[in-house]
Amino acid sequence: MPKPSLIALFAAFATAAAAQAPPAAQVPPAAQAPPTPEAAAPPVIPDEAWKPVDPANTLVVDTTKGRFVVEMHPELAPRHVARIKALARQGYYNGSLFYRVLDFMAQTGDKGNKQYRSSLPNMKNEATFRLTPAIPYLSIGALPTGDAGFIGAMPVLIQPAQGGPASGQPADQAPTSGEGSALFCPGTAAFAHGPSIDSANSQIFFMRVRGPNLEKQFTAWGRVIQGQDVVKALKNGEPPPSPDKMTRVRVMADMPAADRPRLKVLDVKSPAFAALLQQEIAAKGARFSICDVEIPVQAG
């Protein structure tokens, strides 16, 4: 099927990249927003377009505000995903406070809420990754800054190794190799670090709004696929007067089968997702951004 126009997508990305300001400051006043067109009926999603989440790469986070679920991406950041799994299996994150909650992100991950790191060694930064043909990448289209698309639920930007915008590759030819980086959209999960980019250890944060100024600076390891409303509901503060906390953090594969959330995610390679994407682009017009796209999840 023909690819949707990326003119609007590029405009949104160019504006965000040029601003380089905290995400909360980028939201225009409601009075300046253009009128929203009437929403079209969502396309019917056939059963075969849904796929079960991978229990080995799904993190279930219970908090004082409720539960959210994160799709982890070892193909983007293998060391950081391995660290999350190891600390979750140790019970390290259980009881960790959301001690720094700002408009754009919620930070947690300090077991003692005072030591700022686990006993494990710091990790080298994995803010960029190598796209290979083995990684199932869905291209939305070429931008002057790279090729935008999805790896599962994770929005990414690819600098093609060959072809692509820099060398005149047509927009409908998706790259299969090159350097990639995660886009810090709402729901992106990443590791915090100190002055050195190679000092990530146990501190993690979850994006509440878009944060382009964080891209390629911090290692993203996953994206919230269910429960982003929980992340948004966490009490603000640095620290909050009465912080929320993670009560229990588990890799889904480690949970008893009866206790696991029964979730299916829409396959981004499916025609159903392509139809949803085109509908979103048509509805938003020049205001469209890849961060507007929420990957549908089916429970039960």
What is the meaning of each model-derived region?
Residues M1-P4:
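Positively charged n-region of N-terminal signal peptides that target proteins for export
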Residues Q20-G300:
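Cyclophilin-like peptidyl-prolyl cis-trans isomerases
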